[in-house]
Structure formats: structure tokens, C-alpha cells
Amino acid sequence: MKYLLLALALTCGWTAQAFNDDDVRMVKSMKKCVRCDLSGAALRNADLSNAILLGANLQSADLRGADLSNANLEQAKLRGANLQEAKLSGAYLSGAYLGAADLSGADMRDAQLYNADLTEAFIGKANLNNADMRQAKLIRADLSESNLIRADMSRSNLSAATLMGADLRLSLLNNAEFCNTTMPNGKVSYDDC
């Protein structure tokens, strides 16, 4: 029985660190890591501006305060990643998966989030001024008190999303889907249910 528990403990210890150390070194030094495994990596406050992380696996990564401005994160997997206060201005996140990610307080001005999946993401108090969020999945996402001025959310799915206190001035919401969506004034919209 002791050997079984030891084997389980060792196996769990090895699987807890999913990222590849070489990939972490490469992304920090060269700012390029295409389709690499950085899941669970500690990249807090890292300077990854202009990095090329196309298709990278950053699930559950700690990117709090990281500078990812103008980074290419197209098709990246960021499920459950912690991006609190991250700098993502001008970042390219088209087709990225950010389900359940924490983007609270993130600077996402001019970010390209076309067709990104932000299902159940927490995006409260984020700056999404002039962001391209066309066709984004924002199902059950929390965008409370976010700056969405001039954001293009055309054809986005905002079902069950929370926009309480968000600033939507000059935003484009053409054909956006609102079903059980809490609007900035606190009223719930069932327009597209």
C-alpha cells in the first residue's frame, strides 16, 4: 500500500508541472514560442511584448501584470489563465480560447479578439477601448465596469453575460446576441432568447 501511495504521489508531482522548461526559457529570451506548452507556467510581470505565441498552450498560466502588448496569441489556449492587470494593448488574440480566464483590470485597448472564446471569463474593470470583439463568445462572461468605448462587438454572443456599469459609448453591437444579459443599467435583456 505504501508503494502505491508513493507511486501516486510521484506521478501527481510530475504531472502538476505541465509546461516544458525549455519552452519557458525560449519565450523569456527570444519572445517566440509557436505551439509550445506553457500551461501552468509562472510568467508573472514577464516582458512578452511583441512575442509570437501563435497556438501556444498557456492554460492556467500565471500572467498577472505581464506585458503582452502587441503579442501574437492567435489560436492560443488560455483557459483559466490569470491575466489580472496584464498589458494586452494591440495584442492579436483572434480565435484564442480564454474560457474562465481572469482578465480583471487588463489593458486590452485595440486588442484583436475576433472570434475569440471568452466563455465565463472575468473581464471586470478591463480597458477594451477600440477592441475588435466581432463574433466573440462572451457567454456568461463578466464585463462589469469595463471600458468598452468604441469596441466592435458585432455578431458577438453575450448570452448570460454581465455588463453592469460597463461603458458602451460608441460601441458597435450590430447583431450581437443578448439573452439573459445584464445590461450596464442593471436591467436584464431577453431580446434574443
Question: How should each PLM-predicted stretch be described?
Answer:
Residues 13-15:
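N-terminal signal peptide c-region/cleavage motif recognized by signal peptidases
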Residues 1-5:
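Positively charged n-region of N-terminal signal peptides that target proteins for export
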Residues 19-193:
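Tandem repeat scaffolds
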